[in-house]
Amino acid sequence: MYIVIDQGNTILKIGLFEGKAVIKTFQTKEVKQEWFYSILKTYQPQAGILCSTREVSESLLSLLRESLSYFYEFKNNLPLPLSIDYQTPRTLGTDRLAAAVGAWYQKLNNNLLIIDIGTAITIDFVNRKGIYKGGNISLGPAMRLNALHYFTNSLPLISENGNIPIRGYDTETAIRSGVMEGIVHELGSYIEEYEKKENALTFLTGGNTIYFEKRLKGTLFVDKHLVLKGLNEILIYQKKFFKSK
């Protein structure tokens, strides 16, 4: 059994895999070492990988190294099953790469657009030759709502949850519809352009996908575990890579 860990800006997710099959998933906003220890003791995985968009405590890294026969902290020097065509690979988010790998292994030899809607929105492209070609980063829903409140004197801070009419009928719905409809049109344009120019298939993932998956058009594959699946593929690749040396 393998354990894969995706520590994002807001939520930490854990996936347990047997081969390529997802057996169980967990998530938390509060990272406690006792919680990790309980999972490791209960399921006794043999190998694991962790990627993080923020600093990881040394105590957690030590626990994982001591508990697993093989442990990899996913950094940009780790061998990958994709080629990277990006001018600053050291600054490239490992979560973006994991999502790209997860999509690639599901739809080999296709051009792929990978959209991850979380705290931030990332839009990445992998071509049919398995080359990651880069992408864009935009503000996620909460960041947009926070920005409207923070950078103005009178606009309230509101939640993503609630009515989203095509035209706001009060200040709250005007803000929410402006943000959420704006994201729909933004992502819809990306999907349409990549389908036309690259004949790309689109993957959607991320914690905020639920707000948009039914409102976007195109050839869409929604996979809430895409990053975890990609990390699992990267972990499997490490074992194959180092055995071949």
Curated annotation (Swiss-Prot):
A GO cellular component annotation in the UniProt record: cytoplasm
Compartment list: Cytoplasm
Chief localisation class: cytoplasm
Catalytic site: 95 (proton acceptor)
One protein family per Pfam: Pan_kinase
One biological process term in Gene Ontology: coenzyme A biosynthetic process
Protein's UniProt name: Type III pantothenate kinase
Quaternary structure, from the entry: Homodimer.
Catalytic activity: (R)-pantothenate + ATP = (R)-4'-phosphopantothenate + ADP + H(+)
Binding annotation for ATP: 6-13, 119
Keyword Transcription in record: no
Protein family per UniProt: Belongs to the type III pantothenate kinase family.
A molecular function (GO) term: pantothenate kinase activity
Binding of K(+), residues: 116
Cofactor note: A monovalent cation. Ammonium or potassium.
EC number of the protein: 2.7.1.33
Binding site for substrate: 86, 93-96, 171
Free-text function comment from the UniProt entry: Catalyzes the phosphorylation of pantothenate (Pan), the first step in CoA biosynthesis.
CDD domains (UniProt xref): ASKHA_NBD_PanK-III
Record field: transmembrane: none
Names of required cofactors: NH4(+); K(+)
Keyword Transmembrane helix among UniProt keywords: no
Pathway: Cofactor biosynthesis; coenzyme A biosynthesis; CoA from (R)-pantothenate: step 1/5
